[in-house]
Amino acid sequence: MTVLIHVLGSDIPHHNRTVLRFFNDALAATSEHAREFMVAGKDDGLSDSCLALSVQFFPGKKSLAEAVIAKAKANRQQRFFFHGQFNPKLWLALLSGGIKPSQFFWHIWGADLYELSSGLRYKLFYPLRRLAQKRVGCVFATRGDLSFFAKTHPKVRGELLYFPTRMDPSLNTMANDRQREGKMTILVGNSGDRSNEHIAALRAVHQQFGDTVKVVVPMGYPPNNEAYIEEVRQAGLELFSEENLQVLSEKLEFDAYLTLLRQCDLGYFIFARQQGIGTLCLLIQAGIPCVLNRENPFWQDMTEQHLPVLFTTDDLNEDIVREAQRQLASVDKNTIAFFSPNYLQGWQRALAIAAGEVA
């Protein structure tokens, strides 16, 4: 049997590193189909830290796509597992037959599914991508994204799978004995990416709570984002006093980010699609409820796991937030499907499906 090849087709360092380390640490030892990778981007020490994997790096999307297409044409039995498919050339290859449906297995990350960009280039490309998506052999995604995808592609097979968020299961009970009182701290957004709609979110928080809460906005990622960070800071200062606004422009190490999250009382995410699952998981683990847009289908995954969900359209106040905290504290977090290590079973099944080992 031909060994499955995993493709990280776009240079997204943070997510690519998370996936590679997860496969190296949790999957490679038990499956030959978890070891071969083709990655767009620089090595940056990943080969040395992922010794259980065989990783081939490419300078960009185009060179990677050309190599994948060549392999697909040379051996039609070769199967590929595409993680977060942000590579237009690969979609076009699937559409044109360069890659066959039986070779193409896709794990949806969120942004690669939705059509939110307004630029002309995207408007022209989206219909082609939609046609290509009808030809995918199988998609893997959250419950909400599977539901969203099935509305336009009902004949494509879908399987539940969660992004392998870096989590320490021993911290699942860390919030149970914490007392929350006084001024609330609200986390706005999960990164500095514009898709978080930070300014709209800050206005929504202010409309609900006024200048009575402290707002923390993590914007250390992506890099070279100074102009937008300053734009968000100035908009925030028009709404909140300086002591109640904390815009973080430096990237935080994982432990520092965890510490920051534990200081919050609420997460506020206004974007209308699934994204930021990693941050949501870490907040839920810490006993911190989240506010989601009703258009964000991840609320389906949360309710399936009996987790409280607040919406941006709800009338929010401190009593409602504290009640959501109490409800969250009563949940056995060791049973949540999208937490580590529970998502591992889904990955083992996904590998078997993509490799053709199970029907």
UniProtKB/Swiss-Prot annotation:
InterPro entries: WecF
GO biological process: enterobacterial common antigen biosynthetic process; fucosylation
Membrane topology: Peripheral membrane protein
Function description: Catalyzes the synthesis of Und-PP-GlcNAc-ManNAcA-Fuc4NAc (Lipid III), the third lipid-linked intermediate involved in ECA synthesis.
Origin: domain of life: Bacteria
E.C. designation(s): 2.4.1.325
Protein name, per record: TDP-N-acetylfucosamine:lipid II N-acetylfucosaminyltransferase
Keyword Glycosyltransferase in annotation: yes
Pfam hit, one: Glyco_transf_56
Pathway(s) it belongs to: Bacterial outer membrane biogenesis; enterobacterial common antigen biosynthesis
High-level lineage: Bacteria, Pseudomonadati, Pseudomonadota, Gammaproteobacteria, Enterobacterales
